[in-house]
Amino acid sequence: MSAALRFWLRGQSAASNQSSKAPSAAPSPAASSTSLRDQFNKHGRSSTGSVSAAQQEASNIEDAMAAVALIMNDDIDGAEAMLRAREDASTFHQLGVGVSTFLRSILGFEKDIMNEATTRLGETETRAWNDMKKAQKEAEKHGVYGGSVYPQGHPSGGSHIYPPGSEFALVNAEAQLMGAVVAVMHESLTEGIKGFYKLRKAYATLDGIMASELLYLQTLEKKGIITNASSTKTSLDKMPGAFSDSEFATLENTKGANTPSQNGAAADSASVAKDPSGPQTPASASASNEAKTAADVDILDEKLGHLQLDADAASEQNVLPDASLEDTTPSTPQFSHLDQLNKFGADRSLFKSPVDIFVHSGASMCFGILLLIISMVPPAFSRLLSVIGFKGDRDRGVQMLWQSTKYDNVNGAMAGLVLLQYYNLFFGIADILPSELDIQQLSKPSTGGAKFEAVGYPHNECTALLAQMRHRYPDSRLWRLEEARVLANARRIEEALAMLADNNDSKMRQIAALNSFELSMNSIYALDFKAAPVHFLRCVELNSWSHALYYYLAACAELELYRDLFHSGEATSPAALKHKKLAEEYFRKAPTVAGKKRFMAKAMPFEVFVLRKLQKWEERVKAYGLDLADVICVSPAMEMIYLWNGSKRMPPHLLEKARTYLPWERCTAPADKDVVAKIKKLEQDEVAIGLLAESSFLRQLGKSVEARKLVEPLLGVDKSVFKGPTRDDYCGAAAHYEVAAVAWMEACSPEAWPSAPEEVESFRKQKTDECQLHLDKVSKWDGFVLDARFGMRVQAGIDSVKWLKSKKGWM
């Protein structure tokens, strides 16, 4: 669970330990509507006379949403200034301030900001709960139970879909979700446990909101209105797992903020949602202001034109036609606007009032994120999920996120960001994914009439989504970062590097740090070892997430530069000695800055990896009497490419070049001391590292037979060989994963199938079964340092195998 949360929130890297720069002077992005907001001055009071409570609430929602939208345009300071300018700030404004503080805390990972975020979110949680109870009492006073929050006769305001107080229940749930993330990322196990409890309560609240929405849509369907209600089905029959809320009473009582028990918040929201007292009435609508002109489409088409990959572009790069390469270089037809492609879920026109739009888009975004993240939790955490009572649903989670992107507000933007992270990052590290051919042939129409499978990559929709976000938030460097990830995942690594290098001027230091880390890792994948150290040292300046990792990677690059000069006959040249000195300096610096950041009271996995690695090498230094740089054998840079699955981003010529860095002859130990031969004999985990890395390079080149031959001998190595305080304990599990990936590649690549058509199905089933066999072994493997990183790749594989077997009837 922790790895999945970090993955989404950090995007494989850390961010700033400082706040953003000065707010932008550029105009803010448009909110979903300004008609009501314009009627109120900066103090929140009407400029035209008295207004109803419903209209005041609608204005508060729109004003707060418009302010928070500035964050998506790289202006977090401007957002806070706008939110704090209101003298009578509403719950929604308070939520906005909580969101900005939350983002600062998770990006910077500074303890004082995390504590501030915890306090602010706790206050928001309390106020939202109180406002929800107040709204429910107000509704009872006027005899309203299942329709509007406020009395009928205020068509421009309250909800005609959700139970009274649902908008505040949503704010309460959002505050709980953010508070849970901050708690889980705290360096305290107790705080982490409280965080999981908050997640459970938010889960129940959101499911209750979605249940009431489903009833509304079903009512419309009975009237003959097409709504796609089945796509909004509720999943909270009985949450699996069982524990009493009283078990957490002690934890709840230790809070600093005066937060009431939230049993009522979730229970009240869910119970009212599931027992409406009458038919739901659609809200009368104001005209939608989200229609886009043909000129807008042309502009977006031009801006994103270079992302429209086609088969010709792939062939120009000599990308081989194996399954893994096929999935990253699909054909994309002429650009279409997202509105024309996003047919998932209920029609946008069914939600018209500001309150309904806020609740629908927000609940879809929040619940979608929850369902998606829970579905991706590695197998090792399955017992934890059963205790907490969560049930993930990837298909539904992804569909709900696409539903939220239909709305031009910060909820839609956040949903879009999560979707792009899911497709660009999660798919980017996963090897075992359905082929394009299987997706096209086996996908079933969704309720919206479009082909939709959560295990597949919707290229057209993602391109359109990215275009829309860049158009909506033109000053943001966040969306250009995502665009660079799309290029990198298409093996256009040089273009990605150029875009990232030109994207380092974000007003938000946090986003600049994310961009810098992406640039650094892509430099390693591009084998640009001259640029990589500069970029990683820049990461040290920009953020404090894992300086140990940054120094280690900078050292890896310096080591390769030293080796290049050494083997070209310049071992004693000033340049070679400089790179050797820097490599040793950075390697030895890494352990001294490790352990400063912890996650739920545990050391960061890659920092533990670095500590073990340096301990191993220092033992060799003492044993053989050599310099640190000269006792390192298998390329640590190639090992890091393997562990981060960077080979998926590398075009064929770089994959072939990477193989030349793997021979043991690259080691610079004196030949007369026979050091390499001794290490080869004594340290089988070192041998395994080289075989695993080369196997992955061969697999990405489409050479499955050669890849299998390299890695299969590792399956027979006893597990104990890879155990020990300085052993690389991931090698045994990784060997099974590599065989699973090769088997899947053979199952999905037509080039590997038998020539006789009647034998294809049995061959594919056999290879799929083989893949599942090895994935199951990895999922049950004893714990190892990097098990969470492999666990996410394994979970993606398990889901893909399950999907194909289900579609083929092989279950």
From Swiss-Prot:
Its main location: cytoplasm. Residues 14-35 have a biased composition (Low complexity). The gene is iml2. Inclusion body (IB) resident protein that interacts strongly with lipid droplet (LD) proteins. Involved in LD-mediated IB clearing after protein folding stress, probably by enabling access to the IBs of an LD-stored soluble sterol derivative that acts as a chaperone in inclusion clearing. Belongs to the IML2 family. GO terms for cellular component: cytoplasm; nucleus. Interacts with lipid droplet proteins. Residues 14-54, 253-292 are annotated as: Disordered. It is found in: Cytoplasm; Nucleus. The keyword Cytoplasm applies. Keywords: Cytoplasm, Nucleus, Phosphoprotein. Pfam families: Iml2-TPR_39. This is Inclusion body clearance protein iml2. Residues 253-264, 278-291 have a biased composition (Polar residues).
